[in-house]
Amino acid sequence: AVGKIKFDVSEMNIDFLSFTAHKLYGPKGIGALYINNNNPKAKLAKRLFGGSQEGSIKPGTLNVPAIVGFGKAIEICSQDMAKDFDLTISLRDKFYKNIVSNLNGVSINGSMKDRLPNNLNFFVDGVRADKLMLELRDLAFSNSSACSSGSTKPSRILKAIGLTDVQALSSVRFGFGR
């Protein structure tokens, strides 16, 4: 959601929020973690030990060029968010209408209204996602949900929203942007 929609971490009671620069057209390999310091239970245990960089959470030399690039990407996304929001919704909806008009058995996963503007996840009855990916090599898309892309098992996220194993294995995910 960072860089795609406006939200307020206080209003939404967010204690932890991780995000990465490449999702905002910034450099790969750099990310950020928001921790709500006002919540005494929102603590992060050390996983790596060494220097006191990054608030003593992670040792290592800071990648200053990537950090600066990340900051610039956030700045640009903040300025262009409304325009990008409208553009990505338009692209997503046109693409979906085209898919539905040319394929039978297409079902959206989740709601078309209550989703990120740049995301489209659906399945086609009777067509496994891995087979569809082989047939449509000219398109860049993923199977399943973002957190289980590339897995041969049904996505636990898609199953949690009520899909069967077959439907989850038939699901594909498209992302839209500038």
Report residues per predicted region.
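Pyridoxal 5′-phosphate
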Residues: 1-178
